[in-house]
């Protein structure tokens, strides 16, 4: 071992692991070179070491770059050191979902009537039933309400129920995150607007005018299940309480200024969706009673329904925008499709861990969720590259990944650069990851994974400081710069 880089013997072992795994995982034909082409260890290692030293990250760094078609390892540093994957976990979730669900899978949201419709009146209950659609939004609910009117419904004799039991209701993705961060919402079988509500405030003659609404491009329905009170204090900025069936928030007056807005997480997404649907139905002249939860899916006739985009489109957007809720919904749905019945994210992630072991022989990785938000997830660069090689340079994952561009001396993306990258980024506090595929200027395909984390600094953060820790932004910028410089170097050194 020299400066964390692998000498010939261990590089060969890792190369064999990467190449051999591909056959077992997805049945993809790969051509194996009998031995990876080895280059002089000294200059190669020193080049990467200089970049790492210049980044001044501290902590631990692990990376592997390999030929994406043969699995031959070209360079590695701490390849079997397990580090936080952050949102690169979504690449694993993507392949897990594609293995368990058809690529044209859709989530369906339905409006059911448990009795006949006579003279515009539902002689029974009306039911809003979800299957977990992670991209259901207010505009879509408005379309369902319009469809209800078009079907001739004007009133309901029974109750207005909502069903969200297709997936378990989980109030948060990661309990270690601050209460108010919108990237850590609830997850359920009936979701809306990525389970976020818009808090908006304006200065008034006596304090502030405050609204909480389910805003979309076309609508601003206010909600009552999430409430905000302005409190005369300096800190904490936000507090949250689950009170009498509502999300009860307070905000410190000292931070509000003259006005602004912010998305906050919703902890009762099914009730949120039902309340918004009730409001939108009223705009079409349909008066619904207060929504109540249905413990089981009622039997009834479908009046109107909405299908989500197909799975591949959902995965593409999930990888592009790194939406945590989408990852958790799709991951749990995949586990259910595989015969599992998890009641927690960790339980569903355990099923994904088992799948990694059974299909790829990856048994050291540990995921605690499907998004990478949880701090307990760990994977080694060698195992992530093994997954990428198994998926294939021409396989299902690469076209779903977003393009990443190398940068010029001023940090601007060079979109016409001959080196092309498709990858997934990942960022947590003092942890950064980038993993994906590179096409070099002369056409060679590489698979890579880079993981960087300062675990000591991460461990010192308290819950309140995790949204914007001191020094976190500059650390993340240096980490991302290092990752791109490593890729640029690999593309130059290991071109065909």
Over which residues does each language-model region extend?
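N-terminal export signals
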Residues: 2-7, 11-29
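Conserved serine DD-peptidase/penicillin-binding transpeptidase domain
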Residues: 28-53, 100-363, 442, 460-466, ...
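A short, well-structured edge-of-sheet supersecondary motif
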Residues: 53-77
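Short active-site loop at a secondary-structure junction
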Residues: 59, 76-96
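Structural recognition of the beta-strand scaffold that forms the well-ordered cores
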Residues: 64, 127, 326-329, 366, ...
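Residue-level preference for non-acidic, small/hydrophobic
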Residues: 71, 90-97, 160, 190, ...
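A short glycine/serine-rich beta->alpha loop
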Residues: 77-83, 263, 371-374
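Small-residue-rich helix-loop
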Residues: 335-496
């Amino acid at each position: 071992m020299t400066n964390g880089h692998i000498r010939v013997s261990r590089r060969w072992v890792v190369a064999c692991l990467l190449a051999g795994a591909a056959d077992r995982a997805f049945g993809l034909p790969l051509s194996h070179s009998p031995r990876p082409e080895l280059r002089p260890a000294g200059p190669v290692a020193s080049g990467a070491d200089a970049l790492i030293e210049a980044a001044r990250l501290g902590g631990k760094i692990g990376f592997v770059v390999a030929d994406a078609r043969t699995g031959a390892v070209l360079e590695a540093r701490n390849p079997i050191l397990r580090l936080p994957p952050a949102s690169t976990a979504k690449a694993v979730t993507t392949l897990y979902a594609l293995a368990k669900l058809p690529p044209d899978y859709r989530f369906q949201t339905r409006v059911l009537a448990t009795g006949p419709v006579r003279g515009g009146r539902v002689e029974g209950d009306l039911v809003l039933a979800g299957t977990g659609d992670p991209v259901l939004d207010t505009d879509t609910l408005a379309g369902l309400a319009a469809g209800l009117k078009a079907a001739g419904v004007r009133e309901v004799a029974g109750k207005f129920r909502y069903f969200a039991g297709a997936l378990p209701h989980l109030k948060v993705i990661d309990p270690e995150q601050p209460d108010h961060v919108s990237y850590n919402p609830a997850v359920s079988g009936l979701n809306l607007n990525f389970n976020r509500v818009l808090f908006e405030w304006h200065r008034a003659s006596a304090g502030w005018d405050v609204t909480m609404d389910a805003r979309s491009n076309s609508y601003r329905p206010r909600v009552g299940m999430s409430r905000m009170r302005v409190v005369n204090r300096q800190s904490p900025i936000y507090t949250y309480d689950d009170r009498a069936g509502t999300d009860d928030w307070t905000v410190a007056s000292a931070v509000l200024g003259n006005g602004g807005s912010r998305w906050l997480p919703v902890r009762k997404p099914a009730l949120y969706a039902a309340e918004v649907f009730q409001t939108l139905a009223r705009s079409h002249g349909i008066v619904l009673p207060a929504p109540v939860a249905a413990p089981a899916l009622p039997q009834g006739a479908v009046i109107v329904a909405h299908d989500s985009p197909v799975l591949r489109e959902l995965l593409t957007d999930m990888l592009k925008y790194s939406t945590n809720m989408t990852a958790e919904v799709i991951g749990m749905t995949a586990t259910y499709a595989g015969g599992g019945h998890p009641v927690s994210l960790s339980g569903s992630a355990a099923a994904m861990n088992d799948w990694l072991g059974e299909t790829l022989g990856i048994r050291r990785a540990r995921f605690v969720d499907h998004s990478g938000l949880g701090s307990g997830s760990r994977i080694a660069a060698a195992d992530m590259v093994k997954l990428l090689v198994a998926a294939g340079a021409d396989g299902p994952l690469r076209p779903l990944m977003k393009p990443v561009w190398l940068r010029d001396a001023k940090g601007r993306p060079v979109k016409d650069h001959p080196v092309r990258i498709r990858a997934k980024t990942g960022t947590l506090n003092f942890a950064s990851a980038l993993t994906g595929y590179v096409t070099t200027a002369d056409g060679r395909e590489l698979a890579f994974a880079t993981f960087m984390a300062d675990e000591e600094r991460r461990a010192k953060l308290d819950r309140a400081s995790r949204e914007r820790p001191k020094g976190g932004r500059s650390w993340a910028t240096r980490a991302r710069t290092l990752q791109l410089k490593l890729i640029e170097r690999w593309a130059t050194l290991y071109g065909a």
